[in-house]
């Protein structure tokens, strides 16, 4: 029973880490990646469809993303979706493909993105602590219902705290790496 709680706790904390990694991937760093446009949805015959499913999306260099639609009639829809996404660039439509030119980031922009990353990391820490709280409550209930002894309860709480500390440490490492990536000129 207690081992199931440990596994469930670890699994949920791992999901929080994966969510943080996805959030971090959407942040712009010094080098442009296609992750910046991952959340953009294009109106594809009335259905919101991810941009990477209606065309080829590649980073041609450190400041440019090129989008080649599989159907030429989607160019204006893709252009509109990019403008509505408000990612800080205007699409450049040349009739065959769309280019996004990202200007170099200023130090103020970098600091603002670091703030966003810090908030994302803090949200992940809070989520992990909430998972710990749920697990501890389950352990307390088992102890209260006399399914485990007080000593087993103490050991279980210590193990849950260790799992929590490990995951909080991973959040901190991810944030430090992302911060360094953002601030790198």
UniProtKB/Swiss-Prot annotation:
Query: How is this protein annotated for GO cellular component?
Result: cytosol
Q: Per its UniProt record, what Pfam families does this chain match?
A: RRF (PF01765)
Q: Which GO terms describe its molecular function?
A: ribosomal large subunit binding
Q: Name one GO biological process term.
A: cytoplasmic translational termination
Which InterPro entries does the entry mention?
Ribosome_recyc_fac (IPR002661), Ribosome_recyc_fac_dom (IPR023584), RRF_sf (IPR036191)
Source domain of life: Bacteria
Instruction: Kindly state which keywords UniProt assigns to this record, in alphabetical order.
Output: Cytoplasm, Protein biosynthesis
Location(s), subcellular = Cytoplasm
Listed Gene3D superfamilies: 3.30.1360.40, Ribosome-recycling factor
Per the similarity annotation, which family is this? Belongs to the RRF family.
- What role is this protein assigned? Responsible for the release of ribosomes from messenger RNA at the termination of protein biosynthesis. May increase the efficiency of translation by recycling ribosomes from one round of translation to another.
Output the HAMAP family linked to this UniProt entry.
RRF (MF_00040)
Name this polypeptide is given: Ribosome-recycling factor
The organism named in the record is Sulfurovum sp. (strain NBC37-1)
């Amino acid at each position: 029973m207690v081992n199931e709680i440990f596994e469930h706790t670890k699994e949920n904390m791992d999901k929080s880490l994966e969510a943080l990694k996805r959030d971090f991937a959407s942040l712009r760093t010094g080098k442009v990646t296609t992750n910046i446009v991952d959340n953009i949805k294009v109106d594809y015959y009335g259905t919101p469809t991810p941009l990477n499913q209606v065309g080829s999306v590649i980073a041609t260099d450190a400041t440019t993303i090129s989008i080649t639609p599989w159907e030429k009639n989607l160019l204006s829809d893709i252009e509109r979706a990019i403008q509505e996404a408000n990612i800080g660039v205007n699409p450049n439509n040349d009739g065959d493909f769309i280019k996004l030119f990202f200007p170099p980031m200023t130090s103020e922009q970098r600091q603002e993105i670091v703030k966003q990353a810090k908030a994302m990391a803090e949200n992940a820490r809070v989520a992990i602590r909430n998972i710990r709280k749920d697990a501890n409550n389950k352990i307390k209930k088992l102890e209260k219902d006399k399914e485990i002894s007080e000593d087993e309860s103490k050991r279980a709480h210590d193990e849950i705290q260790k799992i929590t500390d490990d995951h909080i440490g991973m959040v901190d490492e991810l944030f430090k790496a992302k911060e360094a990536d953002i601030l790198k000129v």
